[in-house]
Amino acid sequence: MAEETIFSKIIRKEIPANIVYQDELVTAFRDISPQAKTHILIIPNKVIPTVNDVTEQDEVALGRLFSVAAKLAKEEGVAEDGYRLIVNCNKHGGQEVFHLHMHLVGGEPLGRMLAK
């Protein structure tokens, strides 16, 4: 079994977070250090450390990440103008918490993906 993370405690509501969506498969909450006007983290309730650890058994939960992202983008008013979904993987990818998570960012022009 994967190690416990700070996100595990958010899922169980053991530490405070601004949860905007939660069901049996995923939890979504506002980032504590937002990088855009809208910045929400969407995570599977099961600890999956990185994208490299995804298995076929995770497909339903990971599909739910995307359907929840679309729902939240509409609710947040960013769906029409556009937004970005970001999943970082491991150190060089910028992953800081080793519990797979998707960033939904938007609400303003986001610029280029990567600087040259």
UniProtKB/Swiss-Prot annotation:
UniProt record, GO biological process: D-alanine catabolic process
InterPro entries assigned to the protein according to its UniProt record, in alphabetical order: Histidine_triad_CS, Histidine_triad_HIT, HIT-like, HIT-like_sf
Gene3D superfamilies from the UniProt entry: HIT-like
UniProt keywords, alphabetically: Hydrolase, Nucleotide-binding
One MF annotation (Gene Ontology) recorded for this entry: adenosine 5'-monophosphoramidase activity
Domain called HIT: residue spans: 6-115
Coiled coil segments of this chain: none
Residue ranges of the motif Histidine triad motif: 99-105
Active-site residue list: H101 (tele-amp-histidine intermediate)
E.C. no: 3.9.1.-
Keyword Secreted carried by entry: no
Alphabetical list of Pfam families matching this protein: HIT
Positions annotated to bind GMP: R30, D31, I32, N88, E96, V97, H101, M102, H103
EC top class named in words: hydrolase
Record's function text: Hydrolyzes purine nucleotide phosphoramidates, including adenosine 5'monophosphoramidate (AMP-NH2), adenosine 5'monophosphomorpholidate (AMP-morpholidate), guanosine 5'monophosphomorpholidate (GMP-morpholidate) and tryptamine 5'guanosine monophosphate (TpGd). Hydrolyzes lysyl-AMP (AMP-N-epsilon-(N-alpha-acetyl lysine methyl ester)) generated by lysine tRNA ligase and lysyl-GMP (GMP-N-epsilon-(N-alpha-acetyl lysine methyl ester)).
Record PANTHER family: HISTIDINE TRIAD HIT PROTEIN (PTHR23089)
NCBIfam families in alphabetical order: PRK10687.1
Quaternary structure and partners: Homodimer.
Name listed for the protein in its UniProt record: Purine nucleoside phosphoramidase
Species classification: Bacteria, Pseudomonadati, Pseudomonadota, Gammaproteobacteria, Pasteurellales
